[in-house]
Amino acid sequence: MIGLTKVCWTMSKKEVVDNSIKIEYLRSSFDNVQSLIQFADQKIGNLLLIDTITVGIFITYATNYELSLKDLTVWNILLFITGLIFTVSSVILVYKSIIKVVCSAQSELGLFYKS
């Protein structure tokens, strides 16, 4: 009977250690996910800044009356295309960042639940 009690106590002690390791791993996983979200947020902010600068350049040239009408039209078309390229590429990069964060979060938390 004493041997059985000792085996049960050893097993429960091992479970406590395993649970502590899992809790610590979960805590570090959430920290990693939080840092990934901050990284994505920073990238989104940078892309919005680039878009704002592009729109500012577009408005500046579009309202510049010193250019001839022909040049103004060419500049408008070029700046519109440039702004469109920046906008589309930034939207793609934002979605890639969000997908990266979601996939990383799923893999971090998935590793915890599998173990």
UniProtKB/Swiss-Prot annotation:
- Gene Ontology cellular-component terms listed: plasma membrane
Q: Which domain of life is it from?
A: Bacteria
Q: Does the keyword Protein biosynthesis apply?
A: no
Q: Any transmembrane segments, and where?
A: 44-64, 74-94
Q: How does it sit in the membrane?
A: Multi-pass membrane protein
Gene Ontology biological process terms in this record = defense response to virus
Main location group: membrane
- MF term (GO), any: nucleotide binding
Subcellular compartments = Cell inner membrane
Tell whether Magnesium is among the UniProt keywords. no
* Keywords, in A-Z order: Antiviral defense, Cell inner membrane, Cell membrane, Membrane, Nucleotide-binding, Transmembrane, Transmembrane helix
Q: What does this protein do?
A: Pycsar (pyrimidine cyclase system for antiphage resistance) provides immunity against bacteriophage. The pyrimidine cyclase (PycC) synthesizes cyclic nucleotides in response to infection; these serve as specific second messenger signals. The signals activate the adjacent effector, leading to bacterial cell death and abortive phage infection. A clade C Pycsar system. The effector gene of a two-gene Pycsar system. Expression of this and adjacent uridylate cyclase TpPycC (AC A0A1T4LJ54) probably confers resistance to bacteriophage. The genes are probably only expressed in response to bacteriophage infection. Probably only responds to cUMP (produced by its cognate NTP cyclase), acts by impairing membrane integrity.
Q: What is this protein called?
A: Pycsar effector protein TpPycTM
**Taxonomic source organism:** Treponema porcinum
**What is this organism's lineage?**
Bacteria, Pseudomonadati, Spirochaetota, Spirochaetia, Spirochaetales
